From Swiss-Prot:
InterPro entries (alphabetical): Ribosom_uL1_bac-type, Ribosomal_uL1, Ribosomal_uL1-like, Ribosomal_uL1/biogenesis, Ribosomal_uL1_3-a/b-sand, Ribosomal_uL1_CS
Family the UniProt entry places it in: Belongs to the universal ribosomal protein uL1 family.
Natural source organism: Ehrlichia canis (strain Jake)
Record-level GO cellular component terms: large ribosomal subunit
Name of the protein described by the UniProt record: Large ribosomal subunit protein uL1
Keyword vocabulary terms for this entry: Repressor, Ribonucleoprotein, Ribosomal protein, RNA-binding, rRNA-binding, Translation regulation, tRNA-binding
PROSITE patterns with a match to the protein in the record: RIBOSOMAL_L1
Length: 220
């Protein structure tokens, strides 16, 4: 995380304005939220992970790959999946003949065993289909539509911080605020049962090249 903008704490709207004002890079910087959680990441039952649909999207195309067979392939194509394939695509991935330049990978339950053969490739990239994220489903068209509308995943890192994109510096403050609130609420819903007291320690907003800005703690 970048250095703080002094030790001041801003309301969320003012903090987002501060982030946009300080974004000086010659490219469109992303805007992220970083939530420092009161968890012990070494404990499996205190790791926080989930997904959320950003109501105002990401400001870019969300790319999806689908591994399936038979009629599900055509379903995925009609739903505008970016990459679609069966065992042949899996072999291309194994041989590094296909660059999976995507944000999400989906499959159907009956094809999951085949996709598991490339788990060591997809896993480190965070792309392995997971029923918890509804990326292992027969309802591919529905899942693709939801993901492309702006679904992101989040996961606490080894220091107990959740990082999530909420847009870019060209977004309006109102749109960034709506996405910010969606992420905050989603992380709250993933609060481990073992955490009885304080859950959020600190919350920051930050642009790609800018300084992080501390905003009001949103435990309530």
């Amino acid at each position: 995380m970048s250095s703080l903008v002094s030790n001041e704490v801003y309301d969320v709207e003012s903090g987002l304005r501060k982030v946009i004002e300080s974004a000086k890079a010659n490219f469109c910087e992303s805007v992220d939220v970083a939530i420092n959680l009161n968890i012990n990441s070494s404990k499996s039952d205190e790791q926080v992970r989930g997904c959320v649909v950003l109501p105002k999207g990401l400001g870019r195309e969300v790319r999806v790959a689908v591994f399936a067979k038979g009629g599900h392939l055509e379903m995925a194509r009609e739903a505008m999946a970016n990459i679609v394939g069966d065992e042949e695509l899996i072999e291309e991935v194994k041989k590094k003949q296909c660059k999976l330049d995507v944000d999400w990978c989906l499959t159907t339950p009956d094809f999951m065993a085949s996709v598991s053969s490339i788990a060591k490739i997809l896993g480190p990239k965070g792309l392995m289909p997971n029923p918890k994220f509804n990326t292992v489903t027969f309802e591919l068209a529905k899942a693709i539509k939801i993901i492309k509308s702006g679904q992101i995943r989040f996961k606490s890192d080894k220091t107990g911080i959740v990082h999530a994109k909420i847009g870019n510096v060209k977004f309006s403050i109102e749109d960034l605020l709506e996405n910010f609130n969606a992420v905050i609420n989603a992380v709250k819903q993933c609060k481990p049962a073992s955490i009885k007291g304080l859950y959020f320690k600190d919350v920051f907003v930050i642009s790609t090249m800018g300084k992080s800005v501390k905003v009001e703690n949103l435990n309530n």
